């Protein structure tokens, strides 16, 4: 392994808390190649690689501590943001996929340039991406990024109506809905909304790491089901 350096690790973690990924200034292909070498044990693990592996092992404990226990909005936002940022290390991609991507980059079939919400113009052969003074012509695009669970960006009529009427409210700006541990929605006035429950990505902030298989068949779903059964039995909302 690499040499232990507490100062370097603390500096890395501080940067990660403020702006995830800001520590990386290498070209994308260079960083990808280095990560592959770390995964194969050909290079000492970086602070990010080690931290990501720890977060991967801590996922169950993180859910067990976070999901059943309501957190202050600012605390929830900080923890969710930190966990989401580290997913580039803790959740993949698999080494084989990273190697395949590197081959495509080296052969000139994939351009790893990053663009943040560029303008997109259709052309006769595909699309033109425009961001500031940078333009790229592309023949194929793959939407591989899930949108953030930001209630303010939703345009679904059902959810929009519930939000506008105050029956669904965000736990914090940029995050998902405020819910109780059993999935029942909490409205703008702080009261539980009878007959309304929500689980999954749009509850991010009330729960954490909701995209995982853990939350499809895990404790969060169990608490919701137990709550529904109890209310049916007791004839409550």
Could you say what each language-model-derived stretch is?
Residues 1-232:
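Flavin (primarily FAD) cofactor-binding/catalytic cores of flavoenzymes
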């Amino acid at each position: 392994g690499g040499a232990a350096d507490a100062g370097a690790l603390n500096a890395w973690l501080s940067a990660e808390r403020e702006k995830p990924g800001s520590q990386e200034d290498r070209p994308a292909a260079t960083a990808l190649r280095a990560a592959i070498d770390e995964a194969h044990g050909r290079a000492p693990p970086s602070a990010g690689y080690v931290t990501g592996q720890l977060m991967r092992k801590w996922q169950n404990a993180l859910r067990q501590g976070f999901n059943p226990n309501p957190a202050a909005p600012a605390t929830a936002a900080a923890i969710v943001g930190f966990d989401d940022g580290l997913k580039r290390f803790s959740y993949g991609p698999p080494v084989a996929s990273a190697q395949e991507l590197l081959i495509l980059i080296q052969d000139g079939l994939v351009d790893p340039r990053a663009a943040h919400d560029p303008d997109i113009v259709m052309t006769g052969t595909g699309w033109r991406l425009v961001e500031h003074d940078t333009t790229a012509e592309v023949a194929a695009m793959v939407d591989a990024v899930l949108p953030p669970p930001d209630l303010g960006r939703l345009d679904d009529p059902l959810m929009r109506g519930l939000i506008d009427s105050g029956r669904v409210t965000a736990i914090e700006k940029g995050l998902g809905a405020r819910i109780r541990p059993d999935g029942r929605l909490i409205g703008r006035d702080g009261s539980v909304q009878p007959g309304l429950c929500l689980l999954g990505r749009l509850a991010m902030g009330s729960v954490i790491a909701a995209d995982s298989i853990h939350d499809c068949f895990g404790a969060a779903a169990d608490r919701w089901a137990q709550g529904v059964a109890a209310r049916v039995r007791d004839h409550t909302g």
